[in-house]
Amino acid sequence: METIALGVEPRVIRKKEAAKLRKNGIVPAVIYHKGEETVAVSVNEIALNKLVHSAESHIIDLQFPDGKTLRSFIKDVQFDPVSDRIIHTDFQLFAADEVVEMEVPVAISGDSIGVEKGGKILILRHALTIQGLPANMPDHVTIDVTNLDMGHIIHVREIPMDAYTGLSIMDEPETPVISIAPPKKDAEAETESAAG
């Protein structure tokens, strides 16, 4: 997993401060670690957007103006429901030997049988919650869809984790992750015959 540097500035929590920051392209954030006091910071919205909307997960070195660096990952991101802009982020610190839970993006490999028949791949979960040591965390979890046919679904319990040493998926086993939807014409015909 790649490590990315991200500049942060300490901030004082005051009334209306967050709205003022956001207006200037700055996102309020907090840094926390078990048993330690939460630290309020701010981060550049453009730099944060690149990380949040990346197809891979990252370890993040939070760099303060005084030269101090803290190793972390993004634990939570809040979006504005109207504009979809990031309005707040939580960074979690960790030790190298500490088991953590991270959101890791899903990637697809293979040419699906269902797609060759005209179906469409639907990614129902774009990220999975993975538990393990930070050093073992992958950039993404790759799911082979070669044998996935029309109407079939891959659930969390069906994702092989053999290639990912010491890692576990923490999402519910029955959670659907990927499916193949029939072509639009077929789906409309099924709806009409069910209604008829």
Curated annotation (Swiss-Prot):
GO cellular component: cytosolic large ribosomal subunit
Any GO BP annotation: translation
Keyword Coiled coil: no
The keyword Ribonucleoprotein is annotated on this UniProt entry: yes
Region feature (Disordered): 177-196
Highest taxon of the lineage: Bacteria
One Pfam family per UniProt: Ribosomal_TL5_C
Keyword vocabulary terms for this entry: Ribonucleoprotein, Ribosomal protein, RNA-binding, rRNA-binding
Similarity remark: Belongs to the bacterial ribosomal protein bL25 family. CTC subfamily.
Subunit structure: Part of the 50S ribosomal subunit; part of the 5S rRNA/L5/L18/L25 subcomplex. Contacts the 5S rRNA. Binds to the 5S rRNA independently of L5 and L18.
Function, in words: This is one of the proteins that binds to the 5S RNA in the ribosome where it forms part of the central protuberance.
Name of this protein: Large ribosomal subunit protein bL25
Source species of the chain: Chlorobium limicola (strain DSM 245 / NBRC 103803 / 6330)
Lineage start: Bacteria, Pseudomonadati, Chlorobiota, Chlorobiia, Chlorobiales
Gene: rplY
